[in-house]
Amino acid sequence: MSNSFNDTFLKACKGEVHDHVPVWYMRQAGRSQPEYRKIKEKYSLFEITKQPELCAYVTKLPVDQYNNDAAILYKDIMTPLPFIGVDVEIKTGKGPVIDNPIQSYADVERLGTIQPEEDVPYVLDTIKLLREQLTVPLISFAGAPFTLASYMIEGGPSKSYNKTKAFMYAEPKAWHLLMDKLGEMTITYVKAQIAAGAQAIQIFDSWVGTLNVQDYRVFVKPVMERTFSELQKEKVPLIMFGVGASHLVNEWNDLPLDVVGLDWRLQIKEARELGVTKTVQGNLDPAILLAPWEVIEARAKEILDQGLETPNFIFNLGHGVFPEVEPDTLKRLTAFVHEYSANN
């Protein structure tokens, strides 16, 4: 890689002309890399994030290996929750587990606030360290209020989100207070990361697709409007992403953000037809990375042909990299996207 700074990703976020389609992958730092798996034999996720030099190494590894156009900070959306009074444990094969789920208005009232400089200095130190090392933009991220709330109410991952919806419908006052508290936490946490040097922010609303449009507008969209309006003042690109949320992309397009992330269920041309005018990011089905190269290349080409119709397009997956994916496949895919987009 050249030592000069590669700002292709930032240009694409703003819809500015650039010479190739930028590429990065959700969960590019981690599970599919042998070097990472070796580190995980010794340290947990949270232990890695608390060691800035080690965390920076893990974050930077896929950029060096795949020649990607952006790095995304290695951490978890659960990172800030312990500091507002939520006990979280990441269990192998199960994900985040919370032993004291939210069940009442009083539970919501008890939640505290985060002081990033005191509570998560290692996150900020890692960002500062990476800014010294990287020659591509650094993306950081946070969980959106709805998705964090779903974990806090369900006590962990869910397939139906019945407890979350029941709480939302039965306790609207408590729900909106919870959204307000999580919105403020997100704003404070993200602003500190931007101040430390993060050059773009992705908000993961991973599970909001469980809601219909009407409920999204009433129970979630107001806090997202406030959150993005505050973060927009920091003048870095803001990205929104959720899974199974194709019916909400037009709602996201209304928000004060820069990039709409798509999962693999909605084609880019369909998103444009639905009225998405902002930069689009996505959206190769991560399962396709387990197929023969000819299939991967053909699907990537289909996505590129749609994305290349405007300069505001970023190539990514429609969800995170699977552990079974070969690192060489990702390296080859990045090279293909760069070459094909530069010549078309």
UniProtKB/Swiss-Prot annotation:
Gene Ontology biological-process entries: protoporphyrinogen IX biosynthetic process
Protein's cellular compartments: Cytoplasm
Residues carrying the site annotation Transition state stabilizer: D76
InterPro entries noted in UniProt: UROD/MetE-like_sf (IPR038071), Uroporphyrinogen_deCO2ase_HemE (IPR006361), Uroporphyrinogen_deCOase (IPR000257)
Binding site for substrate: R27, Q28, A29, G30, R31, F46, D76, Y151, S206, H319
Record flagged with keyword Coiled coil: no
The EC number(s) this enzyme carries: 4.1.1.37
A GO cellular component entry from the record: cytosol
Family: Belongs to the uroporphyrinogen decarboxylase family.
Protein name: Uroporphyrinogen decarboxylase
Organism of derivation: Halalkalibacterium halodurans (strain ATCC BAA-125 / DSM 18197 / FERM 7344 / JCM 9153 / C-125)
Gene name for this UniProt entry: hemE
